[in-house]
Amino acid sequence: MKSTGGSDAAKRRAGETAADTVDDGMIVGLGTGSTTAYAIETLGRAVDDGLNIIGVPTSFGARQRAIDCGIPLRGLDEVDGIDLAIDGADQLVGDTGVCLKGGGAAHSREKLVASAAAELHLVVDDTKLTERLDQPVPLAVLPDAHTVVAETVRGQGGEPTLRAAANKDGPVVTDNGNLVCDVDFGAIEEPAALATQLSSIPGVVEHGLFVDDVTAVSIGRPDGVSTMTY
């Protein structure tokens, strides 16, 4: 399900812009995905030049990239808080900052890091902008619960699909050992209400709706970048 649209130049501009807001001494949440990767690489170069930061990765992939870039890391339980988290999104309503995440199956840890952060700065290219969220909502589910969860969301008007792995037989398994169920609700008119509804389903570890977490977003375009705050 992971979206790979958008130009590399646009993604790079967004990632670099967010990384440039990081100050010396900050604890920084490091998100997952192709656009956030540019932010991590930019921070790595800044660390080489003397910037003093600590990174808190949201996934195995983010951790490995940060290590490769020379960024000192700690786990979420090893810090008192996070000053700023930088992460991507699969869809974003620009007017409100409501977004959909989970194409990389890391949304459970991403939401944990976002909840611990004083600020969440999203980085996206302009292909991720939409007036209304309408992509399937990723649910991280306990392996034994996926059938029950699927039946429940069908009763709520969703069409669930267990996400299949691309390079192995069987389903995608998250870093935390959960499965991912992508649920198509069509156009989502009330994301906050849907988020509450999904959170109440037994067996759902986390959903990919981020309703009121975002404080800023940098939007990369082929010819520039713009930043909005919320």
What is the role of each PLM region?
Residues K2, F60-Y230:
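Conserved phosphate- and dinucleotide-binding cores of soluble alpha/beta proteins
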Residues M1-Q91:
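N-terminal active-site beta-alpha-beta segment that forms phosphate/nucleotide-binding
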